[in-house]
Amino acid sequence: GKVPVSMGGLGLRAAEDHAPAAYAASVLSAQLQVQDLVGGRQVLDGEEGVLGPEVLGALSVAQGEQEQLRVADLVGMTQRQMSVRVDLHQQRRLMEMVGEGEEREKARLLAVALDHTGDWLNTPPLKALGLHLRSSEFILATKYRLGMPVFDSAGPCPACLHQSDVFGDHAMCCRSGGERISRHNNLRDALFDTAVAAGLGPVKEGRFLLPGNDRRPADVLIRNWVGGKDAALDITVVTPLQDNTMPGAAQTAGHALTYAYERKINGAEEECRRQGIAFLPIVAETFGGWHPDAKREVKKLGAALARHTGQDETEATSHLWSRMSILLQRGNAAILGNRIPNQPGAHIDGII
């Protein structure tokens, strides 16, 4: 929680951690103004009287420096830059607290630090635009992000009756029920609607793209999208906390994204290429990280929308990321909320 959203936390920084950075930045900024006023003497040439050893020592500790900082190390830095160093130290400490055998926690911490995992937390809750989560959805999504127990106890999964854990790992892998399909369809529709609004004339779930079968490699087909070729965007969501990906995800951020991307490529890329179609897997992790190719395509869609509507490109792309992030976490919450483990009821036999 003490690390910013961009590093996998909730952005609830501790004032005691960042106070030295705020004070040092303020003093140094004021000294620069004094220097401009008085001229001549360079008040920041020396360290004495500018920042005391107590301040420099506290800031050094907050940033995790092995040797005490000097004023010369800080001149020209903004408070934001100093605070980022504090945040990075907090992130390192968090990783160091994880034991050697805690593979799941390592994988989670790496996953939540990927780009865009916290977009839903930074999105204003605008109900009119569908950019909001209900309280129950927000609680489930937050617990899952922080690695807290999502359920009160383990027990049989109500969807498939297999044993479920308290953290929601089984729930995210459970193939029974329609929540995973609904999550996929909502993400697909967001990309499709954006392509429509951008005037790209997309086709949803286009049939008979490949000769000899009715496979649908394109959740969204966009004409003339890649070097004059039609592009088949195929959306999938993968959890890094499954048996197939957890060991790699505990070592490398985005391992599950690569795993799912390669599976998609091996499944349809060659057949699409033969038909002159560019096959583009759009892969996301349950925590909200996206494969580099997916990020490129979402950014490209945002740019196309901005050109067609006259919006600012950065703003249009940011709104698209917000929408995708909210939809992903809403889908996760539906999966978790419908898989609260069953517990056997109390057996009353009348015997005292």
Residue ranges and their predicted role:
Residues 201-203:
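Conserved RecA-like helicase motor-core motifs
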Residues 217-221:
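Phosphate-end processing signature that detects enzymes handling 5′-triphosphorylated RNA
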Residues 185-199:
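Inter-domain linker/hinge segments that demarcate the starts of reverse transcriptase
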Residues 10, 14-17, 24, 157-187:
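Short Cys/His-based metal-binding microdomains
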Residues 1-41:
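Amphipathic alpha-helical/coiled-coil segments positioned at domain termini
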